[in-house]
Amino acid sequence: AKDMISLGCKELDMVINVAALKSGMYDYVEQDIKAVVDAACGVPVKTIIEHGLLANDEIKRASEIGVKAGASFIKTGTGWVSGKPTTVETIRLIHETIGDAAKIKAAGGVRDLDTVLAMYDEGCTRFGLGVRSCRGILDEVAKRVAARG
């Protein structure tokens, strides 16, 4: 973390230890996140929970642990793990669990404007989008603005 900050990083992403979480090693997961948060010296840390590998109770637990350890964001995934795309329901579950204690970033499977707007309404403030998705979303925004006259 310190090396990345010295190179100019303004935010850090870290993937939680999913195996430890699934094994019930919650203190270990928390200490791991806290070590990165502490090393970041105030630089925001996003904890990536890889929701596609987790059951709902594990998503809630991972989100709680991230907040307790001082993470600035709970991020749904890296985009590298196959599984389920981020859904509005996942964002709602995370937001119901952590409230405003940390920000939420949706990543993986967010493909259209209606999904972005629904996730925003559920408390998500950041979105990890691919180029094709961005283009489609921006085209849809332009169409809706034009339709308003």
Q: Could you say what each language-model-derived stretch is?
A:
Residues K46-I49, K75, I104-A106, G128:
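Short catalytic-loop micro-motif centered on adjacent basic/acidic residues
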Residues I33-C41, R92-G99, A142:
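Surface-exposed amphipathic alpha-helices with a cationic face
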Residues Q31, G42-V43, D100-K103, V145-G149:
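Short acidic, glycine/proline-enriched helix-loop-strand junctions
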Residues A1-D3, L54-I65, R92-E96, D100-A106, ...:
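Catalytic cores of alpha/beta
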Residues L7-L21, K68-K84, G109-R111, T115, ...:
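Glycine-rich phosphate-binding active-site loops on the catalytic face of alpha/beta enzymes
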Residues M25-D32, E58, A62, G70, ...:
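General structural feature for long, well-ordered alpha-helical segments within catalytic domains
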Residues A1-S72:
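Conserved anion-binding
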